[in-house]
Amino acid sequence: MARFAGNAGGRRKGMKAVLISIRPKWCEKIISGEKTIEVRKTRPKMNPPFKCYIYKCGNGKVIGEFLCDEIININGAGRIPSDAARPTCLEPAELHQYLRAATGFGWHISDLRIYDHPRDLWEFTGLRQTKYGLAPGPITRPPQSWRYVEEEIWNG
């Protein structure tokens, strides 16, 4: 895991990325390296790899980022490939209860970077779907699960 000063230097806009809300308990397991797969009911309509910014619920800050380099399908019974079950930090019953017999997705976490200085939501530009495509706009509240944002490329 790399640490860097996320607010240093200038920035420029990049490609589409994801802002993902994660509870403090799971953030700690991600930071420790124990949790390397984040389970979600949905996934972005883009192929890996893509950047994900971690919004830590409770403190209201973006604490870091990771590269989602693989998406693992979890079938409707909450079954996950055996080699992928442990890195979710979920018991089979928890996984089944969360997905409620629906299909889910395991987002693989790689290239984790935790910011020395957590960032505010207003520093990010959201992307919303319009009839003309994706349009940029301010983020006024955190996503319930995840949302598209513009990728920030920090210099310095």
Residue ranges and their predicted role:
Residues 10-156:
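Structured alpha/beta reader/binder surfaces that contact nucleic acids or chromatin modification marks
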